[in-house]
């Protein structure tokens, strides 16, 4: 009964099904007698027992049958070897036994390598990682592709195996290789929504600008598949090519990747990467991961970092090269700074009409910039809290600031209305003054139109901030 449930397990890795559901691996009851097998069973019967022992993972029987003369590289129906089958089910113990007996780790069938089979196996990452490590230790090539031009790292990235991806790169796997559709490992990770894989690949030097054959970048693939957090991360990342592990030697990289603590070994759990905070994501995105510990030691937050002056950068040990990267990132993220030019705090009575009109035009223009900035924020702000990439403080803080903004805009609207009424009063008095020479109608109409537009713009800005306030309150 249990044996029958296992029928059909060996399926070719990488999503490429074999021509048979069981690939020649028949499952049945194993008659384990105490007699020695060597020389007592016909070769065909030994092969059948060998296949059945492989299927149920009976390591001791496999060893016994190998001792009886079965070839470790014998091929069964459809060309599968014992090692390929063991890799397909992520049986690390069987893989080790077969490799120790001389199995060929570089064997391939129809462009399907054993390493690809292991990377696309169905099993725990712990077992898959052990199998991959064993195969790589026997010189399996991590850059040999299947018929679809997919390499082992692409399969590992697609299936979400972060440790396997890092191990393959440590053994020379090319990060930016593209398959027949132009997908890289990063594209596959973005498509499947594996955030930790995306972060690890960027750290290892993956190029987020490489496009698929239909012209899509990894960020666009993530967005198309509704992985908005990854889309934000890839759009935010400015300089992914400075992978911090790229300059290490192979041995140092392997040591760095595979260092485990006693608890991890005890529980057989490989590291799950902790969620990045806003500071870590920002530094990672611009290639300054090495500054993380320094800034944390000095209790420097992302907000503090982005508002530092040049002397503060130097005081905190931030080099000029790193300063340039931070300032470049800040320039990209920053809303255009509002400049009111040389407007004085008090307008002199001798101010000309042209100068006063210029003041109103500047004020109106800056209000327009503010409206556009708020509209952009509303458009880009995620409607779901789960889609926020960076860590946020309490929403109450944002709501309180929005309330202050609404109050300020209301005050501004009130003052502009007073200004409009005052100007209208002056205009009426001048029109009723018999000594006043009437100006051309076009000028008066133009001035009135400007004032109306200014008032409408300010009122519209106030309404927009009121809507923004309601939006934050709902969240």
Swiss-Prot record:
Q: Residues in domain SAM?
A: 272-334
This chain belongs to the protein called Ankyrin repeat, SAM and basic leucine zipper domain-containing protein 1
Concerning SUPFAM superfamilies, the annotation shows:
Ankyrin repeat (SSF48403), Pseudo ankyrin repeat-like (SSF140860), SAM/Pointed domain (SSF47769)
Q: What is its main location?
A: cytoplasm
From the Swiss-Prot or TrEMBL record, state where the protein is found. Answer: Cytoplasm
The residue spans of each ANK repeat are 45-74, 78-107, 110-144, 148-177, 181-210, 214-243
InterPro entries, per this entry? Answer: Ankyrin_rpt (IPR002110), Ankyrin_rpt-contain_sf (IPR036770), Asz1_SAM (IPR042650), SAM (IPR001660), SAM/pointed_sf (IPR013761)
Summarize subunit and interaction data from the UniProt record for this chain. Answer: Interacts with DDX4, PIWIL1, RANBP9 and TDRD1.
Which keywords label this protein?
A: ANK repeat, Cytoplasm, Developmental protein, Differentiation, Meiosis, Phosphoprotein, Repeat, RNA-mediated gene silencing, Spermatogenesis
Instruction: List every stretch annotated Disordered.
Output: 1-25
Q: Which residues carry this modification: Phosphoserine?
A: 17-18, 20
Gene that specifies this protein: ASZ1
Q: What is the role of this chain?
A: Plays a central role during spermatogenesis by repressing transposable elements and preventing their mobilization, which is essential for the germline integrity. Acts via the piRNA metabolic process, which mediates the repression of transposable elements during meiosis by forming complexes composed of piRNAs and Piwi proteins and governs the methylation and subsequent repression of transposons. Its association with pi-bodies suggests a participation in the primary piRNAs metabolic process.
Q: What Gene3D superfamilies does the database record attribute to this sequence?
A: Ankyrin repeat-containing domain, Transcription Factor, Ets-1
| Nucleotide-binding recorded as keyword | no
Q: Which GO terms describe its cellular component?
A: pi-body
Annotated GO biological process: cell differentiation; male meiotic nuclear division; regulatory ncRNA-mediated gene silencing; spermatogenesis; transposable element silencing
